[in-house]
Amino acid sequence: MKEAKVAVKKKRRIVVTGVGMMTPLGLNTKTTWEAILAGKSGVTPISLFDVSTFPCQISASVKDFKAENYAISPKDGRKMDLFIQYGLAAAVEAIADAKLEITEKNADRIGVAVGSGIGGLPFIEENHSRLEQGGPRKISPFFIPGAITNMLAGQISIRYGLKGPNIAVVTACTTGTHNIGLGARTILYGDADVMVVGGSEMATTPLGLGGFSACRALSNRNKEPSAASRPWDKGRDGFVLGDGAGILVLEEYERAKLRNA
């Protein structure tokens, strides 16, 4: 059986022209990077809900996030899980950082490849509570589009009017990296000239924390939050849940060079 090969007429170079971050260390790339260089940790005791009955009581959560700072109105915010809001905020920063001009003429050559490992746990828990308390009529009509993983990529395209490929691959903890790779391949094979890529997560909820605790995956080093994440250490005892988003703008080199990106 012969191996199938896809012909690429001319190998296209790909560059990063924009970066956006929403992390436990900062609400933008600059603050996050400065904190990393200073050796700071974003892992702290969980204050989002009562964790007294959980073996793991720490996480790396985003702090002081305000959706309105990223042109997400309260009305729209009620339609989106936090992972969508984090990712959209990071995309706003990345696209601004890239100084990307989006027009009717180029919108079909600009796409999105952004995913989430788990998706909308907070939204799922909230609507399950509504169901239990008031029956199915109390469930938000925006529950499904506000919780499923592909809607972050969808919301980015909606915000900017992007008409290129729209991808949302889910591969657990490698989701962000996987989408970056697929976005790059999309440009390489000529299906787009620009791709907004990355991942977003918000899994620090009772269900998320409880689920990972049940499979004994999390560190219980609650008294040493900043020292809990140590994957290659002999004394490691699990990982730490982390929330936030990281978005890149990938661009075909000649295009980026032409516009002095």
Name every feature range the model reports, one short phrase each.
Residues M21, M80, V169:
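Generic anion/oxyanion-binding catalytic loop in active/binding sites
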Residues L48-E101, T149-K163:
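A glycine- and small-residue-enriched flexible loop/hinge segment at structural boundaries
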